[in-house]
């Protein structure tokens, strides 16, 4: 189960690297200034979280490590809850593909949680 969860975390990370690139392209169209700088900062943060989630999935979640479970649960939850509240709920992005990231997040959490239950049973 934990390896399935790790695969979903890796997919989540790859999707968010793609999303970071899309936001970067949005930033390139802005006039140089504070708005462009803040967009680029958001790109940096999103890409960093995506890389961290992938690394944790490969190094820890794949082997059902409890520390990896909590790390990726926290990283992905904070990221996707903000996305849901500030982008999806406000309809700045259509539900599809807007809910793809949260769907991968829920599946990753579900399977990694099942994996944690197995080692405790």
Question: Could you say what each language-model-derived stretch is?
Answer:
Residues 19, 105-121:
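Membrane-water interface at the C-terminal end of transmembrane alpha helices
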Residues 49, 68-86, 105-108:
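Hydrophobic alpha-helical membrane segments
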Residues 14-23, 31-60, 74-79:
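Core segments of alpha-helical transmembrane spans in multipass integral membrane proteins
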């Amino acid at each position: 189960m934990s390896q399935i969860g790790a695969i979903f975390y890796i997919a989540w990370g790859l999707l968010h690297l793609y999303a970071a690139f899309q936001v970067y392209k949005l930033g390139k169209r802005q006039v140089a200034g504070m708005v462009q700088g803040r967009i680029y900062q958001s790109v940096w943060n999103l890409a960093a979280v995506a890389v961290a989630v992938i690394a944790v999935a490969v190094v820890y979640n794949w082997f059902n490590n409890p520390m990896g479970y909590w790390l990726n649960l926290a990283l992905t939850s904070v990221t996707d809850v903000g996305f849901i509240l500030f982008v999806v709920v406000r309809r700045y992005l259509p539900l599809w593909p807007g809910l793809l990231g949260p769907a991968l997040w829920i599946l990753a959490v579900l399977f990694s949680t099942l994996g944690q239950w197995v080692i405790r049973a």
